[in-house]
Amino acid sequence: MSVIELLEIPLIGDTKESQLPSPEEYTYWKDRKNRTFYVDYEIDECYSLVELAKIIIQINIEERDIPKEQLQPIRLFIHSYGGDLEQANFFCDLVQASRIPIITIAMGVAMSAGFLIFLSGHKRYAFKHTQLMVHSGSAAFQGTAEQIEEAQKNYKKQIEEMKAYILEKTTIDEKTFNKNKNKDWYL
């Protein structure tokens, strides 16, 4: 008997026709049952965050008649280098508005937009070696001079709102924030 024959693993039936879920499907449904979700991707317009938002909304709707003290929390693990500020803002608003408590747990990295989402949790935890980072972001504008001017005004407004949000959600004072806001500030 050759070494290759010893390593063969027999399969029962055709896995393509099986009624068993794929490993990804199994993990998804098990995590959903356990109310555990992950933001482990770039926060952009790829709709992963929108899909997660839909799930959180649906759970809130399904459990609207359960007394608040009996609600089981949702755990949201974050490992993200960040991304789009608008996407992060809508998701932060949703998390904060959730009737169901949402616990955010930073693992590895929670930077930029990922850091903002981390701050939105009703309770927050971070693994010991997690890197948290905040900065004023970056943007690119195109269009007419007037369109670019309006876009810049809007971006400055968003940065001021982000500053107010961070100051509200942390013990960082305004002087310290202002001193560090123009760089990648690792906390």
Task: For each feature predicted by the language model, list its residue ranges.
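Terminal-region recognition feature
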Residues: M1-L187
